[in-house]
Amino acid sequence: MATFKDACFHYRRVTKLNRELLRIGANSVWTPVSSNKIKIKGWCIECCQLTGLTFCHGCSLAHVCQWCIQNKRCFLDNEPHLLKLRTFESPITKEKLQCIINLYELLFPINHGVINKFKKTIKQRKCRNEFDKSWYNQLLLPITLNAAVFKFHSRDVYVFGFYEGSSPCIDLPYRLVNCIDLYDKLLLDQVNFERMSSLPDNLQSIYANKYFKLSRLPSMKLKRIYYSDFSKQNLINKYKTKSRIVLRNLTEFTWDSQTDLHHDLINDKDKILAALSTSSLKQFETHDLNLGRIKADIFELGHHCKPNYISSNHWQPASKISKCKWCNVKYAFRDMDWKMESMYNELLSFIQSCYKSNVNVGHCSSIEKAYPLVKDILWHSITEYIDQTVEKLFNTMNPVQVNEQQVIKFCWQIDIALYMHIKMILETEALPFTFTLNQFNSIIKGIVNQWCDVAELDHLPLCTEQTDALVKLEEEGKLSEEYELLISDSEDDD
């Protein structure tokens, strides 16, 4: 097990390039980071060992072990470290697979010179010169085309490595696939037969067994990454708006593509070494506004919602009620985004005004058939079921027929800010005393979509973007939400 980790440890003494590239946290003497809270077991994509995983500082996904986490490396960095060199984005072509094979042959060669070098370093006891598997595990690294695949919404990212062992992948953000069919089985067999030809007979059999066992593995079904896969440990609440702290390794050197980077690895090693020596760790504070988080917040909002508010005589906003056992949800908004709180207040205040205008109800302790529909309005607010849910709620308010249209009365007091917002939604100078179903539907949707256009939101957080993209967004001032920027501007004005 951990053949890749052992190979990185021993081969780092072979060349100067190896000494810079093969430094991984799993081979260091650092104390491992405590991972008692993390119950995810899988393959660390940096050292390829099967162990307990923790969340990466760069992408907030669980893919790094408690030793490698101290290097703070991510496969989305632009520094050409080993993890980055093993990473390719879809589509995977034969040219990209050839780059992986060339990388292995460059960093982990097997020839008589390398074998003799290892014989000289392993000489404490006589048995260590007998080519036992225990002492020469680093020579048993076959070249395979297995990869851990992260399936983001619009792209797939492949991290190639030698992943040994088996483990259930229930909680892992990635799945293991075998890309040998995209290359050539016989050609890859020939590459490995040539590598193992220099090995002693007893190691050849072990090498061949490892190679054929892993190179013929079937691919797993890819798993799409959702917002729940990301860590919440690096989220901060700033102005009641959630931001995410992301750490990335930057270098001054740039490459147009990953294949160009591999071309320089073969033909211009000095450029790679210069890039590694000038790299730095940079912190980004990115907004966490995305469709995945909006769905999670709305689900939580619907779970904590107290629909009894629509029957009450409370004049305070729904989120501020604290002394009514039927309407109290104040504790639920301690960590909630302010936009969710604003939406909740306006939505329940508007529904309260409509409900009290049309239904004879006097207290929030009443049991009404509209209560489940209020929760459904929240849960379905950004789904395709919102129209039929709004219609059901509309029908509970005893609509009457006027000029061949169903209408409800609107004659209950509302907040001035909500009054102005409804005027803006309906594009009218004065609010009518009756609402049709279309008007009622438009107001509900307008309140929900006030702070963000769901159609334009990214599906996943910005921490899934490449480092170059984060740098560009930072230069354009798009890493923070507009609300945070407005606050910053007002503070500067003072």
Swiss-Prot record:
Residues 84-178 are annotated as: Important for cytoskeleton localization. It is found in: Host cytoplasm, Host cytoskeleton. One of its GO terms (molecular function) is metal ion binding. Residues 44-81 are annotated as: Zinc-binding domain. InterPro entries: Rotavirus_NSP1. Pfam families: Rota_NS53. It comes from the Viruses. Residues 1-83 are annotated as: RNA-binding. Signal peptide: none annotated. GO terms for cellular component: host cell cytoplasm; host cytoskeleton. A motif (pLxIS motif) lies at residues 485-488. Residues 320-494 are annotated as: Interaction with host IRF3. One of its GO terms (biological process) is symbiont-mediated suppression of host cytoplasmic pattern recognition receptor signaling pathway via inhibition of IRF7 activity. Keywords: Host cytoplasm, Host cytoskeleton, Host-virus interaction, Inhibition of host innate immune response by virus, Inhibition of host IRF3 by virus, Inhibition of host IRF7 by virus, Inhibition of host RLR pathway by virus, Interferon antiviral system evasion, Metal-binding, RNA-binding, Viral immunoevasion. Belongs to the rotavirus NSP1 family. HAMAP family: ROTA_NSP1. Interacts (via C-terminus) with host IRF3; this interaction leads to IRF3 degradation. Interacts with host IRF7; this interaction leads to IRF7 degradation. Interacts with host CUL1 and CUL3. The integrity of the zinc-binding domain in NSP1 is important for degradation of host IRF3. Plays a role in the inhibition of host innate immunity by inducing the degradation of key host factors required to activate interferon production such as IRF3, IRF5 or IRF7. Associates with components of cullin RING ligases (CRLs) including CUL1 or CUL3, which are essential multisubunit ubiquitination complexes, to modulate their activities. This is Non-structural protein 1.
